[in-house]
A protein has these predicted regions:
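Loop-to-transmembrane-helix entry motif
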Residues: 14, 314-318, 322, 356
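N-terminal signal-anchor/signal peptide hydrophobic helix marking the start
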Residues: 15-26
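Extended assembly-interface/linker segments at domain junctions
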Residues: 19-20, 36-38
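Faces of alpha-helical transmembrane segments in polytopic inner-membrane proteins
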Residues: 24-28, 32-35, 325-328, 350-356
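Residue-level marker of structural boundaries
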Residues: 47-50, 341, 355
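Membrane-topology segments of multi-pass transport proteins
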Residues: 1-16, 39, 43-308
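Transmembrane-helix boundary motif in ABC transporter permease subunits
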Residues: 2-6, 10-11, 39-40, 320-352
Length: 356
């Protein structure tokens, strides 16, 4: 009936008015209370740093049989070299080391030391290419080969003083096909140089990592396709391909062993493998003196169990303080309730005085 419809509309308006009145308070509570708690709870299980910093290493580690008792093979160490090299350029390897140090004592110093040592690994190939032909020393020559014609035209006319953004690097299509690893890592190098360092890519000499990838392409499955390339630097590419067959190679596993013997031991690899997923219960396990392992959660060694002891001590002191307050508070409260008002007020002042 019209009366009922009118009543429903009136009630609806009344509810909306009440909701609007409390809306600012609800929003305030959501922003200042609920959201921080939700963020804290998310951070307690979030663990993206391992996979984001070591993407190639963690991908290959998925197929590693940790129960064999042997550290991973050379392909994993090669991926580790590539990941740590990029991470140390971006100053991320120390953050990862600090994160893993919560789980394995010594991981922080291990990653710092490795960040300083990976440059020497790539220099093995860099020195050989540059000794063979000085052409490979200059960043301009690398860009002439790897960059597209359109990008080269733009970057050569670009001036930093112009205030305009640097034209983003574009790989030459044919090079991406015949030198896939070099192209992939050079793209990372280009993004870092242009966006994070804000430097002129055309004049920047490549990372040592680029030379390692370049060697892999020259001696890999696509090596025969290099002879079909006719663009800039074709003669130098053919020369490099012929020379690379006789280059000194890098044993990545031995190289990391030279940096630190801990890379040839199981604990660091078990830790990386256990904490490679993007979400983890590791923080909660640590809080109760447990740790992740290949066999699931397990107690930490006895000399590392500190949180349970701290919790029991805290619980004991809380109980003692609570009982003391009850034993002191109830008699004082009873006395104050039964004394004359003047005397009770004086005693109340004496009770409150220590708090002031």
């Amino acid at each position: 009936t019209p009366l009922k419809r009118s009543l429903r509309r009136a009630l609806r308006r009344q509810k909306m008015s009440a909701l609007l009145l409390i809306a600012p308070l609800l929003i305030f509570i959501l922003i200042t209370f609920i959201a921080p708690i939700a963020d804290m709870l998310f951070r307690s299980v979030e663990n993206e740093i391992v996979q984001d910093t070591l993407p190639r290493t963690t991908a290959i580690l998925e197929t590693w049989d940790s129960e064999s008792g042997n550290v991973p093979d050379t392909p994993v160490f090669k991926a580790l070299y590539q990941d740590i090299f990029i991470a140390q350029e971006r100053k991320l390897h120390t953050r990862l080391g600090s994160r893993l140090n919560y789980e394995l004592t010594g991981a922080s110093s291990l990653f710092r030391k490795s960040g300083r040592g990976v440059g020497d690994i790539g220099e093995v190939y860099q020195d050989q290419f540059e000794d063979m032909n000085a052409f490979w020393k200059k960043g301009e020559n690398w860009n002439d080969i790897l960059g597209s014609d359109a990008w080269l035209a733009e970057i050569k006319s670009w001036k930093k003083a112009s205030g305009q953004a640097q034209p983003p690097f574009e790989i030459r299509a044919q090079i991406a096909e015949i030198l896939p690893q070099t192209a992939a890592f050079y793209q990372i190098f280009a993004d870092f140089t242009q966006n994070e360092k804000n430097s002129n890519l055309y004049k920047k000499d490549p990372w040592e990592l680029i030379y390692s990838a370049f060697y892999d392409d020259l001696t890999g499955a696509n090596a025969a396709r290099i002879d079909t390339y006719t663009g800039p630097g074709a003669a130098e590419l053919s020369e490099a391909k012929a020379a690379a067959a006789n280059f000194e190679t890098v044993d990545y596993k031995a190289a990391f062993g030279d940096i630190d013997k801990d890379w040839l031991k199981m604990p660091i690899w078990d830790t990386i493998r256990a904490y490679s997923p993007r979400f983890t219960n590791g923080y909660f396990l640590n809080a109760v003196d447990m740790q992740k392992s290949e066999n699931g959660p397990e107690l930490r060694p006895e000399n590392q169990r500190i949180y349970a002891t701290l919790f029991l001590r805290t619980l004991f002191m809380s109980t003692v303080i609570t009982l003391s307050c009850i034993l002191l508070g109830y008699p004082v409260g009873w006395i104050l309730a039964n004394l004359p008002a003047r005397t009770a007020n004086l005693l109340m002042i004496l009770v409150l005085l220590p708090f002031w």
